[in-house]
Amino acid sequence: MTLKYNPFSCALAMAGLMLGLAGCSVADQIGNLNPFNRGEDIMPGDRRSVLANTGDALAGASLSGSSASISANVALSDWSQPGGNAANAPGNVSLSGGDGALLWRAKTSAKVAKKGVRASAPPLTVGGRYYVYDAGGTVTALAGAGGRQWSVSLKPEGENSLTTGGGIAAAGNVIVAATGYGELVALDAATGGRAWTYDLREPARGAPTAAGGKVYVVTVSNVLHAVNIADGGEAWTYAGIPETAGVLSAASPAVSGNIVVVPYSSGEVIAFDTASGDPKWSDTVIRAVRTAAVSGLSDVSASPVISDGTVFATGVSGRTIAVKLSNGERLWEENVGSAYTPAVSGNSVFLIDLDDNLVALNRSTGKAFWSTRLPVVRKKRFFSVWAGPMLAGNKLWAVSNDGKLISVEPATGQILSDRKLPGPAFIKPTAAGGRLYVLAGDGSLSALR
């Protein structure tokens, strides 16, 4: 295996050494993404954030003079990639009903749920089946109203630990699983039979993305692997800047045409030629002055989105950027960050910022249309966290770790509904076939109208 040298690493590494410390409040929220966080005792005293509140920053910024708008509904039959499609840009997905009522719920990983470790990978909907990858390294296929078709454990023999990295992507009749145990495995979508195994040499950081005959996955030390789907052979690899800390809701690459855009936990966003693996351009979501960031983290934990020739990327360092896909030209940057993949549609970029505000940005300028504070719970041993948004049925949807599902009007930011889910949720909803899907922290998959 030959690793390509990263020509952008030195400058970014030096910049990383100059980053200051951030305050407590945002770190507390992101800390709830940690599946091993059982609610540590919070020290007594008056807690004041030393961060500039993102909502305040937006309020003081020059707001866009127009109104937020979204594109027309798109009938999406499959959610085949972690971000819906290879570009992580599913658009405004059609729903049948759109009121969020529960249709069915199916358990997929009861043993893992009992141990208190949750999955961090989105579920897939492909060809009438639903696929879930859990923290125990098991891929489960469901059909109909959640009936189990097959379940395959990818945990190595003799391995007892659970992991949070990895995930799944679909390519035709193949489900490709990147595991937290250091393997990339191709499974038959109908039977779960193993077709091939590729050695990653270390745990996968997030779910893979499959497109154009290749599957792309990043490991925990920021090595990108491009692997041929047909036979599991290595196409090329690339080593990014190693990063010791990162957010568990890891990002996946985005692919459009002959370019794959890859997010790294170092804060880098690099575009590669899909055929050769040669870098085309590099950018970063790291802020020079980290006044609205998670302490000690520069992670691009949200997947980049490619829409109409523009790459939108964000991270927990507190910056969102828009870049030309073709040449890496920076179009705009805004001092607002997110741990979750933005929803891009119409003239807008929607995201949940690090202060639990749902924000609409002008996709052309980065200026804010509106910012809505989501309902939060702050207790001694529990802080609520929102995951989203998902744009479906002309509404923005988000879920929380205190078991809530809300819908929001995209044009104004008005909260339209607030429903109780069967349990806590940590992964943004997905949508396909007219349904909204929520994977709960206990591994259960719910289908909503």
Per-segment meaning from a language model:
Residues 20-23:
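C-terminal motif of bacterial Sec signal peptides marking the signal peptidase cleavage site
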Residues 25-28:
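Bacterial signal peptide processing site
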Residues 42-59, 66-105:
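Blade/loop signatures of beta-propeller domains
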Residues 104-124, 151-169, 196-211, 234-256, ...:
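Extracytoplasmic beta-rich repeat domains
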Residues 140, 185, 225, 270, ...:
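WD40 beta-propeller blade core
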Residues 143-147, 188-191, 228-232, 274-277, ...:
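Short loop/turn segments that connect beta-strands within beta-propeller blades
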Residues 421-449:
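Blade-level signature of beta-propeller repeat domains, shared across WD40, Kelch, NHL, RCC1
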